[in-house]
A protein has these predicted regions:
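Alpha-helical transmembrane bundles and membrane-interface segments of multipass inner-membrane proteins
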Residues: 1-136
């Protein structure tokens, strides 16, 4: 990724996706840019909660565990960048739509959160079907 810095952008799939070196001092969409201490503390606290949920509350649900591992992995990756460099390197730029440049860790967090929401929804649906019409 550092090799992209002097180049600026390098097409990966023409007109679809390119690699573009961008330094992001904020979180998603550069929100809270320049608030490094807050972002480090808030991210660390959120990751501790996710780790707690993974190790003590996931009830042997493999899909939920996979979701939480994705969130942890992506969150830790971005946290390491932020602690060591004061910013996160983003490098994936989708050319077919107007969207922020992001990185692989962001993908892991987003997919993990979406999967976690799906697991919670499916668990609720399963609980409702177990109760039956009289208990609802």
């Amino acid at each position: 990724v550092q090799a992209l810095q002097p180049v600026g952008a390098m097409p990966l799939i023409p007109h679809v996706v390119e690699l573009r070196f961008v330094l992001n001092q904020g979180m998603a969409f550069s929100l809270l840019s320049g608030k490094q201490l807050f972002l480090i503390v808030a991210t660390s606290a959120a990751l501790l909660l996710v780790a707690y949920w993974l190790f003590f509350r996931s009830r042997n649900n493999r899909l939920q565990q996979a979701a939480l591992i994705l969130v942890l992995g992506g969150g830790i990756g971005n946290l390491i960048d932020r602690v060591l460099n004061g910013e996160v390197v983003d490098y994936i730029n989708l050319l077919f739509m107007r969207f922020a440049v992001f990185n692989f860790a962001d993908i892991c967090v987003c997919v993990g959160v979406a999967l976690w929401v799906l697991v919670i929804f499916l668990e609720e649906l399963h609980e409702d079907t177990k109760k039956g019409p009289k208990e609802q």
